[in-house]
Amino acid sequence: MAATASLKGHVLVLSGRLVGPDLGAVTEIGKQLLDLPERQLTVDLSHAEDTLDIAGVQWLVTIYRSAKNHGKQLSFVGISQPQRDALIISGFESIIDD
């Protein structure tokens, strides 16, 4: 299933496969999340498939760093073990342990 996103308050809920060809649909809603006035933001991965390729890792790292650059704190919830492993293998475990 292609990646989709919905914004529920200050929580970005991701669904589907977080892989390169499917990420375009979630990018615009990710920008909307960063534009919110709240300082505490959340990305919920509990509805996303376990599949996470390097483009998916890069997308998560990019939104995390963009939030930091906007003076906000972004946390991830609902991370599956395969998603966590992909971030660790890629060297980006700091975004989930922050």
Predicted regions and their residues:
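Amphipathic alpha-helical interaction surfaces in cytosolic regulatory modules
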Residues: R17-L41, L45-I96
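Short beta-strand/loop segment at the start of cytosolic alpha/beta domains
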Residues: M1-V13
